[in-house]
Amino acid sequence: MQSFRERCGFHGKQQNYQQTSQETSRLENYRQPSQAGLSCDRQRLLAKDYYNPQPYPSYEGGAGTPSGTAAAVAADKYHRGSKALPTQQGLQGRPAFPGYGVQDSSPYPGRYAGEESLQAWGAPQPPPPQPQPLPAGVAKYDENLMKKTAVPPSRQYAEQGAQVPFRTHSLHVQQPPPPQQPLAYPKLQRQKLQNDIASPLPFPQGTHFPQHSQSFPTSSTYSSSVQGGGQGAHSYKSCTAPTAQPHDRPLTASSSLAPGQRVQNLHAYQSGRLSYDQQQQQQQQQQQQQQALQSRHHAQETLHYQNLAKYQHYGQQGQGYCQPDAAVRTPEQYYQTFSPSSSHSPARSVGRSPSYSSTPSPLMPNLENFPYSQQPLSTGAFPAGITDHSHFMPLLNPSPTDATSSVDTQAGNCKPLQKDKLPENLLSDLSLQSLTALTSQVENISNTVQQLLLSKAAVPQKKGVKNLVSRTPEQHKSQHCSPEGSGYSAEPAGTPLSEPPSSTPQSTHAEPQEADYLSGSEDPLERSFLYCNQARGSPARVNSNSKAKPESVSTCSVTSPDDMSTKSDDSFQSLHGSLPLDSFSKFVAGERDCPRLLLSALAQEDLASEILGLQEAIGEKADKAWAEAPSLVKDSSKPPFSLENHSACLDSVAKSAWPRPGEPEALPDSLQLDKGGNAKDFSPGLFEDPSVAFATPDPKKTTGPLSFGTKPTLGVPAPDPTTAAFDCFPDTTAASSADSANPFAWPEENLGDACPRWGLHPGELTKGLEQGGKASDGISKGDTHEASACLGFQEEDPPGEKVASLPGDFKQEEVGGVKEEAGGLLQCPEVAKADRWLEDSRHCCSTADFGDLPLLPPTSRKEDLEAEEEYSSLCELLGSPEQRPGMQDPLSPKAPLICTKEEVEEVLDSKAGWGSPCHLSGESVILLGPTVGTESKVQSWFESSLSHMKPGEEGPDGERAPGDSTTSDASLAQKPNKPAVPEAPIAKKEPVPRGKSLRSRRVHRGLPEAEDSPCRAPVLPKDLLLPESCTGPPQGQMEGAGAPGRGASEGLPRMCTRSLTALSEPRTPGPPGLTTTPAPPDKLGGKQRAAFKSGKRVGKPSPKAASSPSNPAALPVASDSSPMGSKTKETDSPSTPGKDQRSMILRSRTKTQEIFHSKRRRPSEGRLPNCRATKKLLDNSHLPATFKVSSSPQKEGRVSQRARVPKPGAGSKLSDRPLHALKRKSAFMAPVPTKKRNLVLRSRSSSSSNASGNGGDGKEERPEGSPTLFKRMSSPKKAKPTKGNGEPATKLPPPETPDACLKLASRAAFQGAMKTKVLPPRKGRGLKLEAIVQKITSPSLKKFACKAPGASPGNPLSPSLSDKDRGLKGAGGSPVGVEEGLVNVGTGQKLPTSGADPLCRNPTNRSLKGKLMNSKKLSSTDCFKTEAFTSPEALQPGGTALAPKKRSRKGRAGAHGLSKGPLEKRPYLGPALLLTPRDRASGTQGASEDNSGGGGKKPKMEELGLASQPPEGRPCQPQTRAQKQPGHTNYSSYSKRKRLTRGRAKNTTSSPCKGRAKRRRQQQVLPLDPAEPEIRLKYISSCKRLRSDSRTPAFSPFVRVEKRDAFTTICTVVNSPGDAPKPHRKPSSSASSSSSSSSFSLDAAGASLATLPGGSILQPRPSLPLSSTMHLGPVVSKALSTSCLVCCLCQNPANFKDLGDLCGPYYPEHCLPKKKPKLKEKVRPEGTCEEASLPLERTLKGPECAAAATAGKPPRPDGPADPAKQGPLRTSARGLSRRLQSCYCCDGREDGGEEAAPADKGRKHECSKEAPAEPGGEAQEHWVHEACAVWTGGVYLVAGKLFGLQEAMKVAVDMMCSSCQEAGATIGCCHKGCLHTYHYPCASDAGCIFIEENFSLKCPKHKRLP
């Protein structure tokens, strides 16, 4: 065994090393704790039977278990020592690499399996020890595996591909074994093998999981159990703890459950992919050196398999015996299994940290094992392990899925499609199998779609891509193709999927969670797969046509023969997972030294996408590819390796996914230019699609297909789906397939053409810093893609950026010789990678989507939504929705420009998009990609694909135009389809996914825009960059937030403009691309615009001018926008370039409406007039562009919002029509305010429509239809979560835009100005709850609805324009910019408002608002605005009663603090502020903004900083009062209206008192309602106190300590007022405290406790613990990534094991972060924390409320901190349920909200102390898992305050865990004299008994003792 291990050790080491490196990264990513040791541990565990021994604790320990075993260490050392060595040796020499695989199998199986008691391993062990006779060994092993097919098939693989098995291509490994299992497994998979596997195969899987971990045999065994990587992944998921607990632990530990999600993605995805990549590389080298060796078994097939899927057992796959069978079922099954599994535990887990964590024990281990297997693949070359890490969780499934999908898909899909037709070589070709898998997936999605995709995608793409891409990419990829050909083929097929997961990993927590979670279901996975297929098909159309067009496949199928592609994908993801961040950074740094390697790796990773195309090409060119692959692979083996490392790092951060595509972009610069182009094309497509796929996986398979459909549809539309990612490549792809059939020429052409985005942007903008980030993005189409995907997944955005950076670097190098860009971009990539890694890590805990990706977000769309919400909070935690979080975070660090813009944009996107998922959702991850949007997108894309496939096939330009048309159609169709599909998505209630999708789609749309005209292409990249990088913070904010998908698509030009202007300040550089870009968009959009906006324009120039200055003031984007607007407008409307710019800004809304109208028309016109449709799309784009240009921040945001709103779904048509901003807004606001948004949307949409109609002809046109739609959709929207539709269109979109602007530019610059109005509804969750609460408790709203229902119906549609305008302004604050601008034009008074409105958006908005409100709007507009706002809010109760409600809402608007006049402004400000907060809160703020959108006043209220969140619920209460504008003003004062009216921004205290008094009078019933009072309290902090005092304090559960002894404490838990006379707080005793905490948490922990006020508060005080207190504070870093966050007690990330989310952040009383200012600004600058929390406090305790947020009564601090952080958001919705305030508002805050449930530690929210990801309060941030806190002695949660945490942390530092031997144990055995201490997770793993009566623990030794 030792000799075998040594033998294998070399390989095993390589694998292990790779795992060490990769898995270290993975583990690090997965579980944030140091992962080097961990990966080592993993390797050790793998290398040794350490795994079996239960190295899990070690793994859990983090890097802790390095010394787990001497042998393990030795193996580790061997691996590590051989890290470079094995990588080089094993990689180069790798003579035993086949053996390595076998050895790996054997080492893992042998030593590990032996320990794992894998009997099967015994047999495999000997074979693995025969690395030399690998063929024989493999055969034996295979036989053994086959014999043990049920469980050891992985062994088969291990034997066959012992090397392959180790590859962590569980997929692939599983695939050869699947031959036996294929039939059974297919059923299993059909049955969601995950479950079957979980129950029947868990142990085998678990048992083999170690094998899997140790070698792919484990995977194979797992596969045999699971019958494929998917099964492996499923096994992971299915085999929860029981399966392979030892493994489980290591895997889990390795996977780091919280990061595990992402890690799962990374792990799952990368394990297969990364390992595969590494294996590919290793195999490449090994092939080089050991081709003969590998040939032993199947000289070439083994080579191919080992190269392509060495760890995929493709060596044996060469036999094809397994593949056909396994492939037929396995790919699907694998995917399905993976899907279910994904969806079940890993993905869901990824989607939401806990999911994976909770189900993941085995899953995790499996994932870990899988990555372990995988790691060897990417062994020494680069720490792919870490990179793999990224993909472990979500991607583990995808990875194996990809692998299996590749292999099995090839067998399965190929079987149906190619297998029969393809030669055995082809069959053995992993790429082919990948294609087959994809085909299978596609078939699963729908044979029709598949046929369409195949036929349509193959034909056009086949032409250009086939010849050029196929060969060139294949040759280049062949360098990296060997592995790809072998294992990566499957993985590539899966790679696209994997890459999507990779993308998802980026947004893994948002999106991957979506992806995996979504993948969890067959549909999602199939969709994902289809997505991959389509991604391939889209670029090469061949993906679907995989067998039809091998070359096309090569080009399109990144997973195809081009190992590079495969590898790129695999590397991308595996690198991502396996490469540690630092490692990757180093790699990046090193890569800078050897950009070639980076390029190679990047190209490879890009090729991963390209391989999608190549995969198909592989069908035809499989032999060629195979022939080429070995040598090529050898050639690029090392570079890919390094690159994979590089990529891995990126991917691991969820940047890797993008970077991979991006990297290949860089690579294409050199050898892989073609590949880069191709890969980028596909990779971006993949990534973009991943956003969609993962965003949409849950929504439906259709989503994936649709995504793909769009892509395939558009050769350019293909890019449409991946607009951003495909930005260049879609064009390039389209160009490649239609334009230029030269892959090489194409990449360069792309670099030049797509690089018009690249080169143009790189050339022009390349120099710009933004260029660095953005041009890099633009440069790297993949990056753009990533932007798209990232837009889809916030997380992905950074990857996109990174990729863009890398590719940008190389491309720029190529294009502009921008070595600076190379260095800068590389640096950016490094930073981005590191950041992305961070992001990924952060997202690990999360996307989406985090997750996401969110990606982002990643349950189904629902999950996405959940994820989005979760992501919203998570993203808040992460600093973006899901995704948006990691992405934003990484972006922020990534590059100053990118960081600022992209981060902000991402924050916006994440929060708006993800927040809306998610956010992923993006991506989302998104995380994470918008699920709803995705689904709708997918369907729309699909539809557009079907419709536009032909147009897309036209030609480069034709394709582009059709692409634009398609994009437009896809966008529009998506929007129209969204109405069709989105209804389902909406039904799925995935506003966030929608947002993600929107973002993605926006990006797509923008891409088609760009694609529409080659000139545009440059813009598009910029746009993509913008969305991705948010080139200009303004643009990023508005566009990123508003138009990641939509903004990107429709805002692309404007994004570009912005980007160009922002990046290369003048549009002059931008003009080439921008002018041309805007020209077509403007031409297209201009025509429509002229039609829609000509009138508007005329009226709007001055408003626009105001807006423009405002916008510029607000953000550079405005300036950029202006020039861009000029360009766009010029093209659009030759009449007034400058004017038009401004006009555009104002018109943005009109444009949005135009877009809406355009959409409306477009659905009818459809692709009828491609030009026209394109124009419309362009119009959409242009509108966004104009939006972007004119009201860059606002409009773009609006456009984005509108775009999002359409994406949202049911209201998609309405959404489509109302405004892109609306759509976008919907996404933005999707999380919570969807309903509110629906109401607001309705009222605003109506207002917006009316205003629109009023504003201009086009506007009128649109509004006419729109209002009807709105009206129609109003109630649907109302019912559905498309609140953002109308509301964003009206108010939110602009606010969102402004918010974006504010958030980006204003956040820093405007925050001072906006401080007064910055209302940070921090958490999407809170908003959601708020929306729900408000809906539930909105008597006044209902009253108002009843009061003014008569006029309501007519008003929305055609109320008096003035009223409508006002309503629009008030209700449609966001459209106000455009619509209000129109209205302003229409209404003299509004014109100033319009001007002020833009200003409002700007930091100066407030003053402008005040002025305008006071001057014109205050009187009539004010009333009307209030009315409008009332209407939106009233709309909530009655969607139809817009006018009456508006009127009744007048008061409400006032009550909401949305002054009638200022309402519009306020909406800007409020929404902007809210948006800013929302951006921060990512999804939560989206909810808040939704609230804001729901009532412009609400944001105002929020601005006021009290709890203006419940405008819908509570504003309703005050609405009676609200009707009285004066009184309302009082109420509004705290809201914002009063502030504006009276000029008091923060004088809400006195005002609230009045308002409160009024409210009391008017809402006498409400006071009786605890929730209602809470709301009131929230509204008025000062008055709240009075109120609280006046009223009997609300009862809070408490624990009375009867008696305290040394050992026992008698406590009485008082849960009801009658239970105990005196309310005691928690006792000191831990049990008591826990109990108390539980109790009080269970009750209205937040609300009741705080309301225990008066006596209660005072009484408990004596019993309050004397220990240090921590307050729940705001999440200081919006980029907080779950991956970065670890529990301060157990040091594990969120969702680690079953720990659930992390609660927090808790800050020491003395250092509550001052970042609240944003929150405070959002809430109220004056006492934001205090005031915001005061309302909450008030809700909780009036008196305590008085206490400062920090110094507030102990119970109150949580409230203040929480409210401070999410004051407005929580205050309003949470006001009702304060407990929600912390939990839901906060990401996973257990404390206030969760605390209600935390007591049940059923939720076991894990909060963890955030690793200070961001400077500032982060160092003081403490995140804790609920269970850890509850079970840790001396830690109590009292009234939201966490007592004793610091002490417990100090004590824990010295406590060694008896289980994992790591420091930090916090729970000790309660048995007298027992010294065993554990981490909570370790204790649960160790079998300790938790006694909930007293929260004590008994170790296994004493658990049976009395």
From Swiss-Prot:
ZnF endpoints (PHD-type): 1855-1903
InterPro entries noted in UniProt: EPHD (IPR034732), Trans_Reg/Chrom_Remod (IPR052440), Znf_PHD (IPR001965), Znf_RING/FYVE/PHD (IPR013083)
Listed Gene3D superfamilies: Zinc/RING finger domain, C3HC4 (zinc finger)
Keywords: Activator, Biological rhythms, Cytoplasm, Isopeptide bond, Metal-binding, Nucleus, Phosphoprotein, Ubl conjugation, Zinc, Zinc-finger
Primary location class: cytoplasm
Example of a GO MF term: zinc ion binding
Gene Ontology process terms (BP): circadian regulation of gene expression; negative regulation of multicellular organism growth; positive regulation of DNA-templated transcription; regulation of transcription by RNA polymerase II; skeletal system development
Disease annotated for this entry: Smith-Magenis syndrome: Characterized by intellectual disability associated with development and growth delays. Affected persons have characteristic behavioral abnormalities, including self-injurious behaviors and sleep disturbance, and distinct craniofacial and skeletal anomalies.
PANTHER family the UniProt entry points to: RETINOIC ACID INDUCED 1/TRANSCRIPTION FACTOR 20, RETINOIC ACID-INDUCED PROTEIN 1
Protein name (record): Retinoic acid-induced protein 1
Organism: Homo sapiens
